[in-house]
Amino acid sequence: MATNEEAPKTENGVVRRVVVAEDEAVIRLDIVEMLREVGYDVVGEAADGESAIRLAEELRPDLVVMDIKMPVLDGISAAERIAKARIAPVVLLTAFSQKELVERARDAGAMAYVVKPFTSNDLVPALEIALSRHAEIAALESEIADMTDRFETRKLVERAKSLLISSMGLSEPEAFRWIQKTSMDRRLTMREVAETVLEQIGSKK
């Protein structure tokens, strides 16, 4: 089945890399073919959950497409481990749509859920949603980490200022300017300067 769809790509123009895990070889072959026809690069195939995890860790794909019912380790357990390791978003496939399975898949960290039988028109939107959700979560986590880092830096600078005020007799603006100037002169971050002040002056107190 030929397609004129543009290949799904990352922001830098690289084709999306996918690992497919499905214990039934014929179905796995169909999924791989379906993905390749719409432009995904299938970089690894697995027949059980443990193999899927190993491939994901080794290949670091953009996406993992995985059946729920598999030997050795089921897809939901494998998805949970892949999600916890923050390797890639996982899309789970299943022949069942019970509420309990959907909830387990969600709790495991799966980004999307597709019920068999499906066509590329069902699968591709789920993959794109999973990639989009994963990117949003990663951006949010990065923003939170950045905010936390800024808050910690501010606290360290405040503590360093207090030490400079008490040990060098500087005013608060002078102490801040001293940290700022030292940071620029020595090509260090203000956090690094503050940590040095706390370590060197603080240890003498």
Listing of model-derived features with the role each one plays in the protein:
Residues 61, 70:
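Receiver (REC) domain active-site loop signature in two-component systems and cognate sites
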Residues 134-136, 142-205:
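C-terminal output/effector regions of signal-responsive regulators
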Residues 48-51, 72-77:
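Acidic catalytic/metal-coordinating carboxylates
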Residues 100, 118-127:
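C-terminal output helix
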Residues 24-44:
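Two-component/phosphorelay signaling modules centered on CheY-like receiver
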Residues 67, 94:
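Active-site residues of response regulator receiver
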Residues 54, 76-87:
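Short amphipathic alpha-helix used as the core "switch/output" element in two-component signaling
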